[in-house]
């Protein structure tokens, strides 16, 4: 497998200055998967499954049309686990102004509460492993399975920095690339100077346990 993405498939309620939407297909795995499929498909023959695997848990309420949308994009869905009787992860959030920062109003972990991803054995050594925005404990469990990954990237958000920073710090010490916005960098480093903040994250000084 060229690329393995482990993230959330979710339904979101979103509020912005210009409007709102309920039960919108969302989740870090959804957006990362579709973006990767878009760029990968340009190098493939039309149709078929791309060398791009998605790993997540969903509930029985996950819409068949949404599942098919991801499959039609070319994503390999063998890593998707449907939890009997479960409800899909839900997030209610708000974006204001330049929409650079997500404000979490409510999170319903549902099937992701205690979830331990099962990455298919054939996917344990991908060229790229992308740990899309998710609870750091889930990201750590994936790293334990995919020890053969050639390059590992991670995304996170202010919610996990607030409530699971020690776990996030541990995961960040095991990756090649962290994708963070300005606000998240400042939150982790506790420094308004982005150059200093970025360096203190890179060298581990800002993470739990220090250098």
Predicted regions located by residue number:
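Extreme N-terminal starter segment of soluble prokaryotic enzymes
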Residues: 1-4
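Short gly/ser/thr-rich secondary-structure transition/capping motifs
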Residues: 109-114, 156-163
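Conserved phosphate/ATP/ADP-binding segment of small-molecule kinases
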Residues: 147-151, 158-211
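Short catalytic helix/loop segments, enriched in acidic residues and glycine
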Residues: 19-37
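Conserved N-terminal subdomain of the carbohydrate kinase-like
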Residues: 11-23, 40-130, 144-148
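Short beta->alpha connector loops
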Residues: 59-61, 133-138, 157-161
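A short acidic, amphipathic alpha-helical/loop segment
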Residues: 66, 138-145, 166-170
